[in-house]
Amino acid sequence: MHPDFAEDPRNVRLGLCSDGFTPYIQASATPYSCWPVIVTPYNLPPDMCMTKPYMFLSCIIPGPSNPTDGIDVYLQPLIDDLKRLWIGESTYDIAKKENFTMRVALMWTINDFPAYGMLSGWSTHGKLACPHCMEHTKSFNLKKGGKASWFDCHRRFLPANHQFRRKRNLFKLETTETDGPPPKITSYEVFNRVSGLWRFPDVGKRTRYDGYGDTHNWTKRSIFWDLPYWKDNLLRHNLDVMHIEKNFCDNILHTVMDVPGKTKDNEKARMDLKLYCKRPEMELQLLQNGKYLKPKAIYSLTSDEAKSVCHWLKELRMPDGYSSNLARCAGVKTGRLRGMKSHDSHVLMERLLPIAFCSLPNHVLNPLTEVSQFFKDLCASTLRIDELVKMDQNIPIILCKLEQVFPPGFFDSMEHVSVHLAYEALLGGPVQYRWMYPFERFMGDSKRTVKNKARVEGSICASYLHRETSHFCSHYFNHLMLTPKSTRNEVIDECERSMWILSVFRPSGRPFGAQREYWMNDAEMQSAAVHVMINCNEVGPYLEYFQRLNVGDIFTCFSEWFKDQLEKVASSPQIEHLRALANGPRRMVKEWHTYFVNGYKFHTKSWTMGKKTINSGVYVKGVSDGGEDDFYGVIKHIFELSYRYDNNVVLFYCEWFDPTNNGTKINPKHKNVDIRIDRRYNSFDPFILASKCSQVYYVPYPSHHRAKQGWCSAIKTKPRGEIEKEVPDIEVPYQDDEMSHVSNVIEIDPVTNLVDKDVDGSQIDAEVLEELLNNNEDDANNSEDNDEDRHIHEEDNEDDTYFNDE
């Protein structure tokens, strides 16, 4: 579109974020909302992109209230600068020692849903809230609930021959679906629509044009359209995956755990169910005593089951730095989860949700698991186009499967916009460059710099200028001075050693803690020696020759055969090292309780006892891609073996779980791995090279699910390191390295029953029900109108407390 801009890689691409937060550490009686505008460049290596030193505070919109549609008034100086930078500014290139004309373009904005409406000009409230569907949406206002619902708005995204389209009463009452998906409106079409609108509405006021809320949701012409290239951008405003995932997760948790006042399956939802669906067994039933019976839904837990889930979460242990303290969110006595931050919901949604609700029937659990897998794949640090296309096809089916189970009140704007996330990922790439986690942490730092509450914005500006000046000047000093403290799970760099050192002896990690001596017995000596030999690259040709000869078992015969072969070869430095390897290690080895390697922090099983975190789980990848020959275990000892010529190698002595079907089960669809924790591997092969290990943790199932007792779900973790470096980074949102193999969702679980007949429903007084009907206020947990821009950031912009047990 702009080849002259693209041909020079030195031209800068920017992203912009603006969001409101309360600039006080402690709660204040007077609400105050401050809006910083943050700009970040994308022309950086992945480990530097969107980090705090490269997030620039361009302006601050003062409080005490949010600027609503008048935010463009404050953005006008920034837009003027961006227009000038698009033309170009003379800049010195230090690498080429020359001046060049540097140009800058703003790629997109990153905001939560309310701020999305302020910056784009399309209001994100009401039944037309979706900025992709716009006026082509089929959402409607619930008559009893009084809020917008996107129930039965996703069948139109399905293939034309899909069976769901023909179901008359499985979704909306007496309704089939023949329409296709809403058209994708181009940037030029949007520009033509907003050209006649006002640019600068009054600050703090909203402008309503004719047809607002019925045929459109435009409130203004956004100031970003003043940028000459803005109408050429395919993705102008990002849907924030962080807040969408949190709201989706909260709705699931509150509904399944039947939290009073927050569940989407309340009395109003049951009354709306009668109007819009054919589910008579779920409707409120008038009893002879004048009260109404609310049948117990099959998708909700009983009070005891909810308490069991909270107790399970309170006792859950995960690796250091993996998550914040989830135990603080679990109310065991009440059976509720409270005070969950965005990253807590992130971990719960993508990792723990299918385990927590494993007792639900398949037609409820399977779509919840598919939602969990969808966000897990979407949030991977590496995305593949073919897999994103499958995800874009799968998510409408998943939402339709949820619509068969949950009431219309469950489906608000947050559930609906998830249908557009895979498409935005196709346009914009991985979500770690388009979500709000880095900006929330930046605002959390800004909050802690406020010293003068009477001059909030001035305090933030002064502190930011000091930080920016210090970081700029630090580039003129030694690079080592830029890192004032050691980073998590730091490992040593490879040191200068002999060029003849064998690959297996090259250092890869560092121990921590007190050192002890351990004397290995004969069986341990033989197993350790053979394991080191067969994992040495230089021994590979000998090992292949030994296997072709078929002269015996590797663990019993290879060591002596290898010695004999080396005696026939002329001496050289490498051969001498191989002979030292063949002679085996010393019987006395060094032992530690902690070891850092591959970006992981490993503990022995005994060292983790009594701690809030657990780092003893280990996983070794097998040869096949299906995971059938993978090994899972726990670390019993951490040994350093010593050989001649001052060569050392670190081994983990592990207790391996039974890899057969009796001890390890792999879900063929979702690839979840379950381990029977009381079954062990029969063969004596306990050792594994520390450099070849990955970390897992084992999550037991809640106690109320009797069929899963004794089994744990093995969850793999990712090393918390910088990209392509050995030095781990600070706290960042958890992501998988790559997407799982995304398969098309074709299995349709029949909905056999929606009512739990084994549990009595709750009775409601007629007076209470009448009072609810007379109350025209929306549900307290309405996601589209939950004052997200006022209070949710008080949680999210504070750094989570990541547990570290030494």
Would you name each region that the model predicts?
Residues 1-4, 38, 46, 576-577, ...:
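Active-site-proximal segments of catalytic enzyme domains
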Residues 1-296, 342, 365-463, 476, ...:
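Domain-level cores of phosphate- or acyl-group-handling catalytic modules
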Residues 3-6, 181, 202, 506, ...:
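Acidic, serine/threonine- and proline/glycine-rich intrinsically disordered low-complexity regions
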Residues 11, 244-247, 278-281, 285-288, ...:
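Short, conserved interaction/coordination micro-motifs, predominantly
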Residues 293-294, 300-303, 307-328, 438, ...:
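C-terminal catalytic/scaffold cores in eukaryotic proteins
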Residues 303, 314-317, 322-382:
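Long alpha-helical repeat solenoid scaffolds
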Residues 403, 407-410, 447, 451, ...:
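Hydrophobic, aromatic-enriched, well-ordered structural segments
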